[in-house]
Amino acid sequence: MADVYERSFPLNPAAYADKVLGGWLGKAIGGTLGAPCEGKKSKLSLNFYDPVPEGSVPNDDLDLQLVWLHALQTKGLNLTVNDLAKEWLAHITYPFDEYGVAIANLKKGLRPPISGSYNNFFSECMGSPIRSEIWGFISPAQPLAAMEYAFQD
């Protein structure tokens, strides 16, 4: 993946940090406030969050991106799909939908990308897109790098 990082561009560290913080906070707030509605397909009766939540609950939309940050901290920028699979097995415990099937497949010895699709009726769900922001956050002005990370994911 090294060739996708060779492009240089001017980067204002303060502006970059502000944009990442804004993106992360927006995702955290949206995930927290949207959690009670997740998966519901009927008309919603919202109470406008009275009282407003004071904290968050476990949220796969955020938690999985923290696992990817851990992978980056321990493995560096040249992550492989196998690095991500090891992190998945070590740190992801969500048993439902595509996550549970992928974990079971990895434990059976199936490797990516087969581990994510084999016998996985949920493989077209939103897990991957919903956790993709992290790749954009770490690849400012480098859409090809972000795309490569997302592909590995």
Where are these regions (language model features)?
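Structured, active/binding-site neighborhoods that engage oxygen-rich ligands
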Residues: 1-153
